[in-house]
Regions:
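Radical SAM enzyme [4Fe-4S]-AdoMet core and its adjacent flexible, acidic
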Residues: 5-20, 24-164, 168-171
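Acidic helix N-cap motif at the loop->helix transition within catalytic regions
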Residues: 2
C-alpha cells in the first residue's frame, strides 16, 4: 500500500519490485509466504494507476538463477521492466559471504539472459545485457566493469524505512 501511495504522489516514478524468482522460489528465499503474489499484485495495481516505469528486480544467487530466466520471460509477457543484481550480503540474505558456489550454472543463466536481451529491439535492453556481462565478470571474481555510484545515483530503503546507499552496504 505504501508503494501505491508513493506512486499516487509521484506518478512518473520508476519502481522495481524485488522478486527473487517465481512464487515458490521467491517465498522460500524471502521466508515469507505470499510474497511473490503480493509483489505481482502491486505491479498490476501500479499499471492500473497508469504508472509506466514498473517492473521486477531480482538479486541472483546460488539458488535462483534458473528462475531469473522465467521471471524475465514473465516481465516481457507483461510488458514490464527487468533489472538484475548479483548476490551480496544484505538484510534479506542469510549468508556470511558473497560467494556464488555454482558459478558455471549462474554465469550460464546470465549468458542466456544476455542473449535474450540482445535480441530485443530496444537499446535499453542492450545496455542491460552489458550490465549483466559485468555481473558475470563480478561473479567470476574480477573487478567491476562499471563504477559503483551507490548513494550518488540511487539508494535503498529497507523494510523499516532506513535509507542506505545500496542494499549491499551496512552504513546508513
Amino acid at each position: 500500500e505504501r508503494v501505491l501511495e508513493l506512486a499516487r504522489k509521484f506518478p512518473k516514478i520508476g519502481i522495481r519490485i524485488s522478486i527473487e524468482g517465481l512464487s515458490q522460489k521467491n517465498d522460500e528465499l524471502r521466508g515469507r509466504a505470499g510474497g511473490f503474489d503480493k509483489g505481482l499484485r502491486t505491479l498490476l495495481s501500479l499499471r492500473e494507476m497508469g504508472v509506466k516505469d514498473i517492473g521486477f528486480g531480482i538479486t541472483v544467487s546460488n539458488n535462483n538463477s534458473e528462475d531469473m530466466l522465467s521471471l524475465y520471460r514473465l516481465s516481457k509477457a507483461l510488458n514490464m521492466e527487468f533489472a538484475t543484481a548479483a548476490f551480496h550480503n544484505s538484510y534479506y540474505f542469510h549468508k556470511d559471504d558473497n560467494v556464488i558456489t555454482n558459478r558455471d550454472t549462474v554465469c550460464g543463466n546470465f549468458a542466456e539472459l544476455i542473449n535474450m536481451q540482445m535480441r530485443e529491439k530496444h537499446p535499453k535492453s542492450w545496455a542491460r545485457a552489458f550490465f549483466n556481462m559485468g555481473l558475470i565478470n563480478y561473479i567470476e571474481g574480477n573487478r567491476r566493469m562499471l563504477p559503483c555510484e551507490a548513494g550518488l545515483m540511487n539508494c535503498f530503503i529497507d523494510p523499516y524505512g532506513e535509507v542506505y546507499p545500496c542494499n549491499g552496504l551496512e552504513a546508513k
